[in-house]
Amino acid sequence: MALNSSHVAVHYNAGFIVLSYLVSLVGCITTLELLQRRTSRRGLYNWYLLVASCICMGGIGIWSMHFIGNRAIVLNDGNAGSQILYSGGFTAASFFLPIVVLLVAFYLLGVVDRGNWYYIAASGLLTGTAVCGMHYVGQLGISNYNIGYHEQNVVGAAIISVVASFIALSVFFKLRDTWTDSWWKRSLCAAVLAGAVSGMHWTAAVGTVYHYRGTLKAPSTRSREQTVIVCAVLVSISRLQFDHG
Protein backbone atom coordinates (compact mmCIF):
# COMPACT_ATOMS: atom_id res chain seq x y z
CA MET A 1 0.00 0.00 0.00
CA ALA A 2 1.07 3.61 -0.48
CA LEU A 3 2.82 5.40 2.38
CA ASN A 4 1.37 8.59 3.82
CA SER A 5 1.72 10.91 6.81
CA SER A 6 -1.08 9.31 8.87
CA HIS A 7 0.97 6.40 10.15
CA VAL A 8 1.14 5.56 13.86
CA ALA A 9 4.21 6.65 15.86
CA VAL A 10 6.73 3.86 16.54
CA HIS A 11 9.50 3.35 19.05
CA TYR A 12 11.44 0.25 20.11
CA ASN A 13 12.06 -1.69 23.32
CA ALA A 14 15.80 -2.44 23.54
CA GLY A 15 15.31 -5.45 25.80
CA PHE A 16 13.17 -7.31 23.26
CA ILE A 17 15.61 -6.41 20.48
CA VAL A 18 18.46 -8.09 22.37
CA LEU A 19 16.26 -11.04 23.36
CA SER A 20 15.15 -11.60 19.77
CA TYR A 21 18.77 -11.87 18.62
CA LEU A 22 19.63 -14.28 21.43
CA VAL A 23 16.65 -16.47 20.52
CA SER A 24 17.77 -16.51 16.90
CA LEU A 25 21.29 -17.36 18.01
CA VAL A 26 20.04 -20.37 19.99
CA GLY A 27 18.17 -21.62 16.93
CA CYS A 28 21.17 -21.09 14.63
CA ILE A 29 23.64 -22.77 16.99
CA THR A 30 21.36 -25.80 17.32
CA THR A 31 20.86 -25.90 13.55
CA LEU A 32 24.58 -25.97 12.77
CA GLU A 33 25.21 -28.53 15.51
CA LEU A 34 22.60 -30.86 14.01
CA LEU A 35 23.95 -30.35 10.49
CA GLN A 36 27.45 -31.06 11.78
CA ARG A 37 26.26 -34.48 12.97
CA ARG A 38 24.97 -35.51 9.54
CA THR A 39 27.06 -38.10 7.70
CA SER A 40 26.74 -40.01 4.43
CA ARG A 41 26.50 -43.32 6.30
CA ARG A 42 23.32 -42.85 8.36
CA GLY A 43 20.16 -42.88 6.24
CA LEU A 44 17.03 -42.38 8.33
CA TYR A 45 18.94 -40.67 11.11
CA ASN A 46 20.34 -38.24 8.55
CA TRP A 47 16.80 -37.35 7.50
CA TYR A 48 15.85 -36.83 11.13
CA LEU A 49 18.80 -34.46 11.58
CA LEU A 50 17.89 -32.62 8.37
CA VAL A 51 14.26 -32.09 9.39
CA ALA A 52 15.20 -31.19 12.97
CA SER A 53 17.76 -28.64 11.78
CA CYS A 54 15.18 -27.03 9.47
CA ILE A 55 12.65 -26.80 12.29
CA CYS A 56 15.24 -25.27 14.61
CA MET A 57 16.35 -22.73 12.01
CA GLY A 58 12.93 -21.98 10.55
CA GLY A 59 10.90 -22.20 13.73
CA ILE A 60 13.34 -20.67 16.21
CA GLY A 61 16.14 -18.93 14.35
CA ILE A 62 13.70 -17.12 12.04
CA TRP A 63 10.06 -17.39 13.17
CA SER A 64 10.56 -16.96 16.92
CA MET A 65 13.07 -14.17 16.33
CA HIS A 66 10.51 -12.35 14.20
CA PHE A 67 7.66 -12.44 16.69
CA ILE A 68 9.78 -11.71 19.74
CA GLY A 69 11.40 -8.91 17.73
CA ASN A 70 7.97 -7.53 16.91
CA ARG A 71 7.29 -7.31 20.64
CA ALA A 72 10.00 -4.66 20.65
CA ILE A 73 7.84 -2.51 18.38
CA VAL A 74 5.82 -0.13 20.55
CA LEU A 75 3.07 1.75 18.73
CA ASN A 76 1.11 4.89 19.59
CA ASP A 77 3.24 5.72 22.66
CA GLY A 78 2.53 2.36 24.26
CA ASN A 79 -1.27 2.55 24.28
CA ALA A 80 -2.39 -0.97 25.23
CA GLY A 81 -5.16 -1.10 22.64
CA SER A 82 -2.87 -0.05 19.80
CA GLN A 83 -0.24 -2.80 19.87
CA ILE A 84 0.27 -5.34 17.08
CA LEU A 85 -2.09 -8.34 17.02
CA TYR A 86 -2.05 -11.36 14.70
CA SER A 87 -4.49 -13.57 12.84
CA GLY A 88 -3.98 -17.31 12.99
CA GLY A 89 -3.80 -18.20 9.29
CA PHE A 90 -0.85 -16.13 8.08
CA THR A 91 0.96 -16.64 11.39
CA ALA A 92 0.77 -20.42 10.95
CA ALA A 93 1.78 -20.18 7.29
CA SER A 94 4.79 -18.04 8.23
CA PHE A 95 5.96 -20.82 10.57
CA PHE A 96 5.92 -23.56 7.94
CA LEU A 97 7.20 -21.49 4.99
CA PRO A 98 10.86 -21.18 6.09
CA ILE A 99 10.97 -24.81 7.22
CA VAL A 100 9.93 -26.04 3.77
CA VAL A 101 12.37 -23.72 1.96
CA LEU A 102 15.20 -24.68 4.30
CA LEU A 103 14.57 -28.38 3.66
CA VAL A 104 15.56 -27.73 0.06
CA ALA A 105 18.47 -25.46 1.02
CA PHE A 106 20.02 -27.82 3.56
CA TYR A 107 19.39 -30.88 1.40
CA LEU A 108 21.43 -29.25 -1.38
CA LEU A 109 24.29 -28.77 1.06
CA GLY A 110 24.22 -32.47 1.89
CA VAL A 111 24.36 -33.64 -1.72
CA VAL A 112 28.14 -33.68 -1.56
CA ASP A 113 29.99 -34.12 1.73
CA ARG A 114 32.31 -31.16 1.40
CA GLY A 115 29.89 -28.96 -0.50
CA ASN A 116 30.73 -26.84 -3.55
CA TRP A 117 30.18 -23.21 -4.36
CA TYR A 118 27.16 -23.79 -6.60
CA TYR A 119 25.25 -25.65 -3.91
CA ILE A 120 26.39 -23.24 -1.21
CA ALA A 121 25.34 -20.22 -3.29
CA ALA A 122 21.94 -21.79 -3.98
CA SER A 123 21.54 -22.64 -0.31
CA GLY A 124 22.50 -19.12 0.76
CA LEU A 125 19.96 -17.67 -1.67
CA LEU A 126 17.24 -20.03 -0.45
CA THR A 127 18.05 -19.34 3.21
CA GLY A 128 17.88 -15.60 2.60
CA THR A 129 14.60 -16.13 0.77
CA ALA A 130 13.26 -18.14 3.72
CA VAL A 131 14.12 -15.30 6.09
CA CYS A 132 12.50 -12.64 3.88
CA GLY A 133 9.50 -14.78 3.01
CA MET A 134 8.78 -15.57 6.64
CA HIS A 135 9.04 -11.90 7.59
CA TYR A 136 6.58 -10.59 5.03
CA VAL A 137 4.11 -13.48 5.34
CA GLY A 138 4.23 -12.97 9.10
CA GLN A 139 3.52 -9.28 8.57
CA LEU A 140 0.45 -10.20 6.52
CA GLY A 141 -0.86 -11.79 9.71
CA ILE A 142 -1.06 -8.42 11.49
CA SER A 143 -4.80 -8.04 12.01
CA ASN A 144 -5.22 -4.51 13.35
CA TYR A 145 -2.99 -2.49 11.00
CA ASN A 146 -2.48 -1.93 7.32
CA ILE A 147 1.24 -2.04 6.59
CA GLY A 148 3.37 0.04 4.23
CA TYR A 149 7.04 -0.42 3.32
CA HIS A 150 9.87 1.79 2.10
CA GLU A 151 11.26 0.13 -1.02
CA GLN A 152 14.91 0.78 -0.17
CA ASN A 153 14.50 -1.04 3.14
CA VAL A 154 12.89 -4.02 1.43
CA VAL A 155 15.81 -4.28 -1.00
CA GLY A 156 18.43 -3.71 1.70
CA ALA A 157 16.86 -6.32 3.98
CA ALA A 158 16.89 -8.90 1.19
CA ILE A 159 20.55 -8.23 0.37
CA ILE A 160 21.56 -8.52 4.04
CA SER A 161 19.75 -11.82 4.54
CA VAL A 162 21.14 -13.46 1.38
CA VAL A 163 24.74 -12.22 1.70
CA ALA A 164 25.09 -12.95 5.42
CA SER A 165 23.46 -16.38 4.99
CA PHE A 166 25.87 -17.19 2.17
CA ILE A 167 28.89 -16.13 4.23
CA ALA A 168 27.84 -18.14 7.29
CA LEU A 169 26.94 -21.29 5.35
CA SER A 170 29.99 -21.17 3.08
CA VAL A 171 32.40 -20.85 6.00
CA PHE A 172 30.62 -23.59 7.94
CA PHE A 173 30.31 -26.15 5.15
CA LYS A 174 33.77 -25.57 3.72
CA LEU A 175 35.48 -25.92 7.09
CA ARG A 176 33.20 -28.21 9.09
CA ASP A 177 35.46 -31.27 8.66
CA THR A 178 38.10 -29.48 10.73
CA TRP A 179 35.57 -28.18 13.28
CA THR A 180 34.40 -31.45 14.83
CA ASP A 181 35.46 -30.37 18.31
CA SER A 182 35.41 -26.59 17.75
CA TRP A 183 32.04 -25.57 19.16
CA TRP A 184 33.13 -21.95 19.41
CA LYS A 185 33.85 -21.77 15.66
CA ARG A 186 30.38 -23.13 14.91
CA SER A 187 29.02 -20.57 17.36
CA LEU A 188 30.72 -17.77 15.41
CA CYS A 189 29.09 -19.01 12.20
CA ALA A 190 25.78 -19.19 14.03
CA ALA A 191 26.26 -15.61 15.23
CA VAL A 192 26.66 -14.48 11.60
CA LEU A 193 23.61 -16.50 10.56
CA ALA A 194 21.58 -15.00 13.42
CA GLY A 195 22.88 -11.62 12.27
CA ALA A 196 21.43 -12.33 8.83
CA VAL A 197 18.02 -12.97 10.36
CA SER A 198 18.13 -10.02 12.76
CA GLY A 199 19.71 -7.67 10.23
CA MET A 200 17.02 -8.45 7.70
CA HIS A 201 14.25 -8.07 10.28
CA TRP A 202 15.34 -4.71 11.65
CA THR A 203 16.27 -3.24 8.29
CA ALA A 204 12.75 -4.07 7.14
CA ALA A 205 11.20 -2.98 10.45
CA VAL A 206 12.59 0.56 10.41
CA GLY A 207 11.19 0.95 6.89
CA THR A 208 7.70 -0.16 7.92
CA VAL A 209 4.78 2.16 8.65
CA TYR A 210 1.58 1.18 10.44
CA HIS A 211 -1.88 2.54 9.60
CA TYR A 212 -4.46 1.64 12.23
CA ARG A 213 -7.69 0.05 11.05
CA GLY A 214 -10.02 2.29 13.00
CA THR A 215 -13.11 0.24 12.23
CA LEU A 216 -11.87 -2.72 14.26
CA LYS A 217 -13.14 -3.43 17.76
CA ALA A 218 -10.77 -2.89 20.67
CA PRO A 219 -8.51 -5.95 20.50
CA SER A 220 -7.50 -8.47 23.12
CA THR A 221 -3.79 -8.97 23.78
CA ARG A 222 -4.19 -12.76 23.86
CA SER A 223 -2.63 -13.35 20.42
CA ARG A 224 0.53 -11.49 21.47
CA GLU A 225 0.91 -13.52 24.65
CA GLN A 226 0.20 -16.82 22.89
CA THR A 227 2.89 -16.09 20.32
CA VAL A 228 5.49 -15.48 23.02
CA ILE A 229 4.51 -18.73 24.76
CA VAL A 230 4.90 -20.68 21.51
CA CYS A 231 8.34 -19.11 20.99
CA ALA A 232 9.41 -20.10 24.51
CA VAL A 233 8.31 -23.70 23.92
CA LEU A 234 10.23 -23.85 20.64
CA VAL A 235 13.42 -22.57 22.29
CA SER A 236 13.08 -25.27 24.96
CA ILE A 237 12.68 -27.93 22.27
CA SER A 238 15.77 -26.56 20.53
CA ARG A 239 17.77 -27.03 23.71
CA LEU A 240 16.61 -30.64 23.98
CA GLN A 241 17.58 -31.26 20.34
CA PHE A 242 21.04 -29.82 21.01
CA ASP A 243 21.56 -32.09 24.02
CA HIS A 244 20.18 -35.30 22.56
CA GLY A 245 20.29 -34.91 18.77
Give the label of every model feature segment.
Residues 1-245:
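Peripheral, non-catalytic segments of secretory and membrane proteins
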